[in-house]
Amino acid sequence: MLMYFQDSFARLMTIHHVAAFDIVKQHRMWVITEVQMDIRPTVTYWSEDFTVEIWVSELTSLRIYCDFRIVRKDNEQLIASGTSQWNILNLDTKRLETTDFLADKLTVVPELMTASHKKVRFPKPQSFDMLMEHRATRLDLDFNFHVSNRSYVTIALLTIPDEVLASQTLASVIVHWLHETYLDETLTCHMSHIDDGSYLHTLTNAEGIVVCELMSRWQQQPEIPEVSEVLNRDL
């Protein structure tokens, strides 16, 4: 779902001529720093059509907030919704730039805000329930040769216990991306089971610097149809 949202974000920015390949000519780069997503307990199939609705809900001097909904195309049943935070990075100075040049290009729709834009503060656990190391490979990289933001999510969720995966499905996820990492770097993921039933995943680099924080919450899996029911669908 994160992939579909990011692809839709790229398409929206392309329409407004401020996509990654547009602003790189001005030595600028899009950087996603946070995403919050709520996921409904529903079963989707590979052959189903769905729609991603996306819009800018707030534009501040340094941040762009983009909200989204993913719905089934046939009945508009909600599959997932959320919000994201983006910044513009100057490639020469490695500092954040203002969003002034976007003001006349993007339409802001604040009344459709799907979630609060107030920064979520993660708890600081005193102990960890699991520790896992991961060495970044080429499969983890994006087109900028950094570890992809989606790779951090994949690595973090590998620390979820098997018994949870066997009976539950993801209900919500909050991700903070803090620092870049690269090929062959070793990432350490510390997982803690929080009192409210959520799981906190903290990824650090070899220097112990936190590069990504993720909070996942899980819910009971919906009833899954028999294989025969799936095969008999009118596709």
Give the positions of each predicted feature.
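Acidic/His-leaning functional-site neighborhoods
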Residues: 132-217
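Intrinsically disordered, low-complexity segments enriched in polar/charged residues with Gly/Pro
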Residues: 29-30, 55-58, 74-76, 125-127, ...
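HotDog/MaoC-like acyl-thioester-processing domains
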Residues: 36-38, 44-122, 181-183, 192-235
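Hot-dog-fold acyl-thioester-processing enzymes
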Residues: 1-32, 81-83, 90-171, 223-235
